[in-house]
C-alpha cells in the first residue's frame, strides 16, 4: 500500500526522510512521535539499549496496527519505523508519523499506534546499566 | 510430532538457545505446549506473562498445533 | 529560557532543525505537530495562503502558551515556530515540538499548544481561491 | 486624548488602513472604543467577533484606555 510505510531496520532512523514521505498536498496536519533512548530509568543511568525483534511477526503486527488506524480515523498516510540492534543514549528506536486532512485524526491515530505497538509488536528491549542488563517488563 | 520453538528476549536466555525442539502428540494445543515447556524450563513461570505465536499470529490456549507450524515464545514485549 | 524556542518568521520553517533542537538525552518521547497548507478547503481548490501576524503580541501569546504547557505537564522543552507571508500548497505554516521523559506529557502538551495557538495567537490567514480571497473565520 | 488603533487581517480591510486615529475622552473604556469604531465602521459588527488588545494583552470591555497605550483590533484569529 502506498499510503503505509513500515520499516524495521538495524540502521539509524532518519526523521527528515520520514517527514518527506508523510507530507502531501492533501494533508493539513501531521503528527510525528519520536522515541529516544533516555539516559536514565527510574533515576538509574542507562548505558545503552539492545532491541531484538521477531522480524516477520513484528512487521505483520505493525501492518495490522496501521490498518486499524485507517479503519478508526480518516487518516491519509501512516509511517512506522522501528530500530533493532544496539542503540546509544539519544538515538531513536521508533518514529511514528500520521498525516490527515485535520489534526484531530492525526493526533489520535499517532497516539493509538505507539500505544498499541508497545502492547502487541514482538520487539524486546534490554537495558544496560553499570551493574548489569535487564529485559524490560519481563518480570512482575 | 517434533516441533521447533523459537525464543526471543528473556525466553532465549531461559532456554539457553534461540530454538528448542520438543516432541508433542499430534493433537497438542498451545496449553499442552506451555505445560511441557514450563516443566522443562520452570523460570518461564516467573515471567510477568508470555504468549505463544503460531505462524506469526498470537495463538489462544485451545489452538491446536500442526506439524511444520512456526511456533514462537513471546515474552512481554517492550518495543517503542 | 533555554527550554523554550519561539520563532515567528517569513522564511521557510525547517523541520530537521526543530527536531535537532528538541532532542536531548533526558527525553524519552517527542511529539511534533506539523501544519501544512492543504490544496483544498471544503472541496474548493486553494491556490495559496497569506499569513499576517501582530508580531510582538503573537510572540508574547506563544510564550504564554509554552509557559502554560510547562505548568500543566512534566515536559522538558517546547518549540513553536510559525510562518508569516505567502505560503504555497504543501508549505509549512506551523511546527510545534514537545519533549518529555514520558510520551503522555509530550502528546498532551503538543495537542494543547496547537489547539490554544489557534484560539489566542494574533495571526490571520487569508485563503486565495480561483474566484477570490477570504480571511479565514472572520465572518459567522 | 487622541489614540491610534492598529488593525490586522479583515479589520485592516474594513478600516481601509492598518492604523486609524480616534479622539477619546480621558476615562474611555474598551467598551466606549468599540462603540465609536462600530459607528464609524459598521462592517465591524458583521465579524464573527473581535477583541481589542492593549499593550499586547487582550483587554476586557471595562478596561480603561490611557494615552500612549498601544491599541489593536484583533478579528477572529486563524493561525496554525
Regions found by a protein language model. Give the residues of each.
Chain B
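Ubiquitin-like/PB1-type beta-grasp interaction modules and other compact soluble beta-rich domains
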Residues: 1-78
Amino acid at each position: 500500500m502506498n499510503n503505509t510505510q513500515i520499516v524495521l531496520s538495524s540502521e539509524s532512523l532518519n526523521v527528515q526522510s520520514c517527514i518527506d514521505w508523510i507530507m502531501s498536498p492533501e494533508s493539513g496536519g501531521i503528527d510525528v512521535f519520536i522515541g529516544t533512548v533516555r539516559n536514565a530509568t527510574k533515576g538509574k543511568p542507562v548505558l545503552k539499549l539492545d532491541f531484538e525483534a521477531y522480524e516477520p511477526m513484528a512487521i505483520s503486527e505493525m501492518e495490522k496496527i496501521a490498518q486499524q488506524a485507517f479503519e478508526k480515523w480518516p487518516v491519509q498516510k501512516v509511517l512506522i519505523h522501528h530500530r533493532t540492534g544496539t542503540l546509544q543514549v539519544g538515538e531513536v528506536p521508533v518514529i511514528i508519523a500520521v498525516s490527515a486532512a485535520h489534526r484531530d485524526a492525526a493526533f489520535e491515530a499517532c497516539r493509538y499506534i505507539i500505544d498499541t505497538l508497545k502492547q502487541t509488536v514482538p520487539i524486546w528491549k534490554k537495558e544496560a546499566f553499570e551493574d548489569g542488563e535487564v529485559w524490560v517488563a519481563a518480570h512482575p | 510430532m517434533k516441533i521447533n520453538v523459537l525464543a526471543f528476549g528473556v525466553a532465549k536466555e531461559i532456554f539457553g538457545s534461540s530454538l528448542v525442539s520438543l516432541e508433542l502428540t499430534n493433537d497438542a494445543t498451545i496449553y499442552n505446549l506451555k505445560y511441557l515447556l514450563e516443566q522443562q524450563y520452570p523460570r518461564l513461570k516467573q515471567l510477568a506473562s508470555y504468549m505463544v505465536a503460531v505462524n506469526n499470529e498470537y495463538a489462544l490456549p485451545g489452538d491446536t498445533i500442526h506439524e511444520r507450524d512456526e511456533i514462537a515464545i513471546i515474552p512481554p514485549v517492550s518495543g517503542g
